[in-house]
């Protein structure tokens, strides 16, 4: 039956420091992954699971806290691939801090998310935008 699937490990093309690692994306808290001030450029996030799982969908959550959401870069266009060589989904994410569902409907042991474009951070109350790409949570739903 369908249930949340938690990765056993992840890799990110970069992170701001250890406090902003990709593990924060599946810790069910409001901690975030942030890149190393690259504005989402060439971002790749890769998640590995203990077994091959049939993934129905994933849910991506930008920073819920409005100041972080406004001032950080956010993923816009993403490409999702897996260890199944012919599988690919491209999706344009909304520039908001609500949960966004993306249907996968594929078997995979590894899921890779590439950020192809981004929404820039914006000034807030006279404070400059951040240069970091930020994301709060990715939930994976599937059947093992």
Positions of the model-derived regions?
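Disordered, acidic Ser/Thr/Pro-rich linker "stalks" and the adjacent N-terminal cap
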Residues: 1-48, 66, 70, 143-144
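Intrinsically disordered, low-complexity N-terminal regions enriched in serine/proline/glycine
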Residues: 15, 25, 53-56, 86
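Trp- and acidic/polar-enriched beta-sheet ligand-binding modules for extracellular glycan
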Residues: 38-44, 64-144
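Hydrophobic beta-strand segments within beta-rich accessory/binding domains
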Residues: 45-47, 56-58, 113
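Generic detector of ordered secondary-structure context
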Residues: 50-51, 58, 105, 130
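Secondary-structure boundary elements
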Residues: 51-54, 110
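A short beta-strand element within beta-rich, extracytoplasmic domains
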Residues: 53-68
């Amino acid at each position: 039956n369908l249930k949340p699937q938690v990765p056993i490990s992840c890799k990110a093309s970069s992170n701001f420091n250890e406090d902003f690692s990709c593990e924060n994306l599946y810790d069910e808290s409001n901690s975030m992954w942030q890149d190393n001030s690259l504005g989402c450029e060439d971002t790749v996030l890769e998640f590995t699971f203990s077994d091959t799982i049939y993934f129905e969908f994933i849910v991506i959550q930008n920073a819920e806290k409005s100041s972080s959401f406004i001032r950080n870069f956010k993923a816009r266009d993403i490409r999702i691939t897996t260890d199944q060589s012919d599988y690919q989904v491209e999706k344009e994410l909304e520039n908001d801090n609500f949960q966004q569902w993306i249907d996968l409907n594929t078997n995979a042991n590894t899921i890779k998310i590439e950020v192809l474009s981004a929404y820039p951070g914006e000034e807030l109350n006279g404070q400059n935008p951040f240069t970091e790409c930020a994301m709060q949570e990715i939930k994976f739903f599937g059947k093992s």
